Regions:
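Mid-domain alpha/beta scaffold segments of enzyme catalytic cores
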Residues: 1-111
């Protein structure tokens, strides 16, 4: 049977606060062997790292900014983002890019 990886898990969402262990257990029981833990804003980083360290054998993590949060970015935010990347050595950079589906940040803010 093939192994499956979910490369975009938003486990920092409050929706997972009560049953994350069970969610991971069910996924592993269904052959999902790796989880990409996505950091979509710096305010999620502490929670993300706590989750990552609890499930380190099956997770990798990213640090970035989802385009919906582009309106939060300024020079100080970018400085903190670079520091977080340097200190925490994520497996990848992300979220990044453009996303106009819900228009939570304007085109100008995302560019």
């Amino acid at each position: 049977m093939h192994e499956i990886a979910d490369i975009a898990c938003n486990f920092t969402s409050d929706r997972f606060d009560k049953d994350l262990d069970e969610v991971i257990d069910r996924a592993v029981a269904n052959n999902i062997t790796k989880f990409g833990l996505i950091c979509s804003r710096l305010s999620d980083l502490d929670k993300l790292l706590e989750i990552y360290n609890r499930f380190i054998k099956v997770m990798f993590f990213t640090i970035g900014v989802h385009p919906h949060h582009a309106n939060e970015i300024n020079a100080e935010y970018l400085k903190k983002l670079k520091e977080a990347i340097s200190i925490n050595n994520p497996h990848a950079i992300g979220e990044t890019g453009l996303d106009f589906f819900r228009n939570l940040s304007t085109y100008e803010e995302q560019i």
